[in-house]
């Protein structure tokens, strides 16, 4: 299991949220058979979505992030609740790309930077809250920093890092960080935090070296007072059920269900988020056809 921590810095003038999520990223890699670059791309997206979801208030609230960068990896979709559970998928999970000029996984090229980032908060109201911003780099962290500034009017420092073993492709570490100064935060504090960017970029490396999340944060922001206010366990968890897939089939309507019965004599649906397959026999489809008729 991973963990999310929340806290305050610099005499309570700066909000801090961080995550260690090796298991989240590795579970996603295993479920989707991800290439190394897609492990990094989806992993980063899962980490930021999980942190944002943890800020939701209601037990049934959901937050979904949709990255449409226009790159060959396709769209990335992740959903989280406020209890640390997150799930997600990437459209082209097997994509392989050469390393970038720095010798690192070319996440930016895989994701693309010509599209849009969308955040959907479903708070159980009549309509969900939807925020959007343009992609700026495809590195994901920079794109979410842009989103916080443009869509939520909250300047933020965002870091996301996933360390992937170059030999077997397994995840060695995953870490994320959101730092947000409050409106009354002094300029010198903001400057001090911005000076820590080189250290911030070492977070995944520290986690890979076995340094605990809180200790890593204190090392990064050494000299700035820090108080941790909350900690939460996290994990990759899909909440798909057979009943939910039945409702999907019913929603297709009588004509399409009848077509499945006549031509396919059954149906097999696959959950995008966890790749679990659900098979429905011809008789089961006939039962759903009856329910679809009652619903009309």
Predicted regions and their residues:
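Interaction interfaces in information-processing and related assembly proteins
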Residues: 1-230
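Cys/His-clustered metal-coordination modules, chiefly Zn-binding fingers
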Residues: 198-296
